[in-house]
């Protein structure tokens, strides 16, 4: 496939100071530099920024950025979008400068989520040393994974699988009532897609959210780093969304917490890596092997 990894997220924010505290003091990222003096550029590795937070009137996901290997692979994305009748725009000079890439295109999925595909990122070779000593699991696996909200799970399945070429790794059946369908109606599906060895880089939930994003997963190297982040979050009174647990599909050991933007970050380790030649996509019938009590997120 042409798309290789989730490379960056651009997030509009109403409280930049809260995001600065959260990104640097809770997540343990390192501040980078960029062309927008008002934006916060958060580094995890040699990418110029994996998260870009910029001020605005809303708290929402603005763009998810997806990396291709070269100009030929980006052209494949263009060709596939054109064949499917999906409009796209070429990146402006300002966008290319801000993302520090050679080329990019912008387009929307069937639910209106904005995506960018690009190639030729200019890496930043100043070492990233987290103030808390941990390293993020990125490289060919990219930033992590993102769960987007969708208004049509069937259309999203066709778009990401058939147009963009993502590989379906797992599915989870949800009660139809969860998305406003009758009890005897079609089930809703939570789909998990991969584009590299990470079990999934993308999933979508058929439920609208104010921010357009359900959660973003960030992975570190070991369970101590997860526990230390949990301690930092609790000390800073960050609202928890789910307790520590281990998922059944990607085996991630993680907890969930709220961001200043209202969506969740899953902070975890030990995520499963797969090989497409031998992987068999199946249906998961549980969320976690243990833990992940999401009721804590519903408490006042």
Curated annotation (Swiss-Prot):
Pathway: Steroid metabolism; cholesterol metabolism. Keywords: Aromatic hydrocarbons catabolism, Cholesterol metabolism, Dioxygenase, Iron, Lipid degradation, Lipid metabolism, Metal-binding, Oxidoreductase, Repeat, Steroid metabolism, Sterol metabolism. One of its GO terms (biological process) is response to cholesterol. It catalyses: 3,4-dihydroxy-9,10-secoandrosta-1,3,5(10)-triene-9,17-dione + O2 = (1E,2Z)-3-hydroxy-5,9,17-trioxo-4,5:9,10-disecoandrosta-1(10),2-dien-4-oate + H(+). One of its GO terms (molecular function) is ferrous iron binding. Fe cation binds at residues 145, 215, 266. Its cofactor is Fe(2+). Disruption phenotype: Cells lacking this gene grow on cholesterol at a rate that is 60% that of the wild-type and develop a pink color consistent with the accumulation and nonenzymatic oxidation of a catechol. Its EC number is 1.13.11.25. Residues 5-120, 142-270 form the VOC domain. SUPFAM superfamilies: Glyoxalase/Bleomycin resistance protein/Dihydroxybiphenyl dioxygenase. Substrate binds at residues 200, 215, 250, 256. Binds 1 Fe(2+) ion per subunit. Gene3D superfamilies: 2,3-Dihydroxybiphenyl 1,2-Dioxygenase, domain 1. It is an enzyme of class 1 (oxidoreductase). The keyword Ion transport does not apply. The keyword Iron-sulfur does not apply. Belongs to the extradiol ring-cleavage dioxygenase family. Homodimer. Catalyzes the meta-cleavage of 3,4-dihydroxy-9,10-seconandrost-1,3,5(10)-triene-9,17-dione (3,4-DHSA) to produce 4,5-9,10-diseco-3-hydroxy-5,9,17-trioxoandrosta-1(10),2-diene-4-oic acid (4,9-DSHA). Also involved in biphenyl and polychlorinated biphenyls (PCBs) degradation. This is Iron-dependent extradiol dioxygenase. It comes from Rhodococcus jostii (strain RHA1). The gene is hsaC.
């Amino acid at each position: 496939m042409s798309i290789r990894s989730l490379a960056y997220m651009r997030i509009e924010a109403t409280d930049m100071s809260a995001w600065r505290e959260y990104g640097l003091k809770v997540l343990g990222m390192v501040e980078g530099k960029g062309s927008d003096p008002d934006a916060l550029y958060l580094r995890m590795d040699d990418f110029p920024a994996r998260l870009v937070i910029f001020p605005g009137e809303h708290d929402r996901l603005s763009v998810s950025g997806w990396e291709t290997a070269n100009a030929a692979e980006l052209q494949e994305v263009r060709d596939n979008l054109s064949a499917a009748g999906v409009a796209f725009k070429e990146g402006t000079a300002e966008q290319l400068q801000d993302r520090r890439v050679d080329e990019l295109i912008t387009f929307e999925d069937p639910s209106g989520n904005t995506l960018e595909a690009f190639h030729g990122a200019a890496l930043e070779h100043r070492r990233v040393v987290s103030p808390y000593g941990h390293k993020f699991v990125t490289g060919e696996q990219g930033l992590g994974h993102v769960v987007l909200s969708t208004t049509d799970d069937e259309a999203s399945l066709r778009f990401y699988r058939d147009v963009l070429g993502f590989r379906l790794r797992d599915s989870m059946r949800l009660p139809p009532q969860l998305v406003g369908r009758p009890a005897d109606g079609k089930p809703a599906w939570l789909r998990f897609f991969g584009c590299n060895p990470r079990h999934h880089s993308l999933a979508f939930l058929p439920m609208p959210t104010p921010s357009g994003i359900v959660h973003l997963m960030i992975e570190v190297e070991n369970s101590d780093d997860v526990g230390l982040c949990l301690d930092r979050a609790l000390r800073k009174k960050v609202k928890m969304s789910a307790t520590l647990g281990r998922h059944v599909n990607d085996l991630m050991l993680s907890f969930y917490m709220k961001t200043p933007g209202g969506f969740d970050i899953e902070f975890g380790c030990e995520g499963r890596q797969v090989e497409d030649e031998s992987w068999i996509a199946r249906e998961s019938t549980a969320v976690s092997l243990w833990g992940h009590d999401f009721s804590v997120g519903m408490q006042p």
